[in-house]
């Protein structure tokens, strides 16, 4: 959040405000940002770079508000060295296993685009028609990059890059002790108000009691009620009002929607999706693609009754007539620049919408008719399942897209079981641009990674024929990503075998400092301090954390997401709250299960923090979490303060070394 004060834009800490402006939990990590963008409603006439303008707003480059920047230029040329006008230039950052486009610009008559960026590395992908090219722009070393469109869609190519983020610079305390004390009192007051409300949420025990009353699975129901947080009363009303013979159906509905849906969906919406007749519950796709009300990322609404009336009014009795009627809906994408999905009821009432909303409507209508349907995870196009086949729909003619198979072969041990949307992704190359396909997302995990390689590729995966890219990456402890890209083709009716390479991170095991080995904490459930047991061989982690703070929450989500990996390693890890107040505020049920090797405790009178800070010469001890990896001699080889991407993986990379 930014505010205009004294003639300039300044930022504040969003839902965790600090004593002064331009201080937030992200003040340190945002120095490592390559690009920061703000979306402004309407036209914007400020001094910052405008990266796009549409009917609803403007995209503003605000990177310079947060970190050191450099103006850069990308020139696109053809194979003859001539500038290419109107080439599409995508600036990409490796994030969640893919080269993600953060900005898209189009070249001018000189073949150039300009953009102000942070002082790190960024991947640039340029295309026009069937021609494409790419390269790495290392902003700290160069301010200009030339990209040659020397490749054609269908060519086979590969490349590897070490993408280094901007350097983080140490900063002194930005607020005084007095200001911090006043702000902490505000936080305490806010926490007390919040905790009074949170205390009204249904507990796991209470959920189990209600489950026994309703005659449903105790553990499942209790888990849903705890996950629903402040929305528990709506779920409770839903389960009490649904007909007893449909409670199993109702439980399956709660199990198939995302955790966030449990927290904000009204009972009436849930009830609407278990009403009606003719449910083919024996269909193997029933729960996921018929009962499930979610099609994409739209708000869940009660649409089935309105869709039934639409089907009846237009005498639609099969999928063919539904395709014909849906094709009559007027599509005007230009009216929907915000790309917010119009609910199916809104599409029916207006008779005009955008492509995505029309496709969502079609899938919702199919599911209402009892026909399994989805937006293809591969192409994003609407599909329905009939006679053992998924059929792709284009609303003019029914089309069965030729398909082939892909098998990724991974024999390395760089990463024991690579995760989709973390270590690798697959994207389809269409008209020069890459569209990442969803082979294993995990909507139930907040900012979590997807399914693992061993889960996805137990057998070959079916894909549409065409050109594809495999992106892989491994993040070092300094934030740099060892990224690779390889293209391949999938041919109709054939099996394509591709070897997946994830380059190992060779960490520089420098001794960053030496801390006392006689470190102690007050273990969870105890009142007296006990010594931290450092490993005889290798390294362990000590993390000083705060409760209900975003940087700590990110770290804890990383740890729960890697539960099996850390348990297989078997090394004790110490997670220590800065004081007893923070330990008291922490609610473990807000997170998924943690690795059993995590040892919880409290820092007694700040002694642990003081010992670590003195040994490491830390000038700023306010930025938490503080993660230290050390051996039995107290030699520290890794230090991290505040928010950092992929901390769980970085901890694993170091302590798993033999």
Where do the language-model regions lie?
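Short active-site neighborhood of thiol/selenol oxidoreductases, capturing the structured segment around
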Residues: 531-555, 559, 572-575
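Secondary-structure boundary elements
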Residues: 86, 190-350, 360
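Hydrophobic/aromatic-rich core segments of domains that either
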Residues: 1-48, 123-124, 312-315, 321-325, ...
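Thiol-/selenol-based redox modules, centered on thioredoxin-like
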Residues: 623-658
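Short, acidic Ser/Thr/Gly-rich low-complexity loop/linker segments typical of extracellular
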Residues: 95-116, 432-458
